[in-house]
From Swiss-Prot:
SUPFAM superfamilies: S-adenosyl-L-methionine-dependent methyltransferases. PROSITE patterns: SAM_MT_TRMB (PS51625). It catalyses: guanosine(46) in tRNA + S-adenosyl-L-methionine = N(7)-methylguanosine(46) in tRNA + S-adenosyl-L-homocysteine. This is tRNA (guanine-N(7)-)-methyltransferase.
Length: 284
């Protein structure tokens, strides 16, 4: 009699089965077990390009790969591979314009896909299993919608935004950044791990084009105040007024589409929203 599989083996078998090309059922979260948070200062052995121009987006957005021409050579996107070995970078017909930082299980990505059908949206998530869940979720949605080509415009990437955001995006490339229900890091000694800070806001200002918007939402009043304080203190951002904020369709999606947002709703909690517009670059 065969021994019963333990939970870890069941998870591994399930995820291996999800890699088959004919799977049409949505992945189940219980097979993608992961800690709630990850330390952004740890060495996660992440893969990242040395420069945005050397990022190969073709595997993430295969429907948007440009026709083959003379493609520039690039170094491999890895900290462990031989950086002297050149590789070909397949260009896309358009750039990624929207980033969901800490995308979790991908609720916002999936909701934005039909609302922004002509825009490439990327989820950035540091946790391995959660990233795999979102990847499998998008693959299934693409298979289910082969005729309409829906969900080809969204993808997910395992990345540490606190360290490597400028490695993926050129100056002014993004029109929107979403920061939804980030880890509040309640202890004062952990505040340096918060995804909004003076230093990180400068990186957001670099990646977001003038007129672009950073969207924030949390159910923690203290963290909301922290994010507002740090963005309002930054010379390249201004807070968007309440009337304009509530008229933005992305705000309603952000409130209700994320898994954390739904959890807060079930618990009858309060959601705090703030938007910040990227100002024009100063003229010297």
């Amino acid at each position: 009699m065969a021994a019963k599989k333990n939970k870890k083996q069941k998870r591994e078998d399930y995820r291996a089965a999800m890699k088959q090309d004919d799977v049409l059922t949505m992945p189940r979260k219980k097979f993608y077990r992961q800690r709630a948070h990850a330390n952004p200062f740890s060495d996660h052995q992440l893969v990242y390009p040395p420069h945005p121009d050397q990022m190969d987006w073709s595997t993430l957005y295969p429907a948007y790969v440009a026709q083959e021409e003379s493609q520039p050579e690039a170094t491999p996107s890895s900290t462990t591979e031989d950086l002297s070995a050149p590789v070909k970078v397949k260009k896309l017909t358009q750039d990624v314009e929207v980033a969901d930082i800490g995308c979790g299980f991908g609720g916002l990505l999936i909701a934005l896909a039909p609302v922004m059908p002509q825009t490439l949206v990327l989820g950035l998530e540091i946790r391995v299993s959660v990233t795999q869940f979102v990847e499998d979720r998008i693959k299934v949605l693409r298979r289910q919608n082969e005729e309409s080509k829906a969900y080809q415009n969204v993808s997910v990437l395992r990345a540490n935004t606190m360290k490597f955001l400028p490695n993926f995006f050129r100056q002014g490339q993004l029109s929107k950044i979403f920061i939804c229900f980030p880890d509040p890091h309640f202890k004062a000694r952990k505040h340096k791990q918060r995804i909004v800070s003076t230093t990180l806001n400068s990186e957001y200002a670099y990646a977001v084009r003038p007129g672009g918007v950073v969207y924030t939402i949390t159910d923690v009043p203290d963290l909301h105040g922290w994010m507002v304080q740090h963005f309002e203190a930054h010379p390249m951002f201004e807070r968007v007024g309440v009337e304009e904020q509530e008229g933005d369709p992305c705000v309603e999606i952000m409130r209700n589409a994320t898994e954390e947002g739904k959890k807060v709703e079930r618990n009858k909690g309060e959601k705090f929203v703030a938007l910040f517009r990227r100002l024009e670059d100063p003229v010297f």
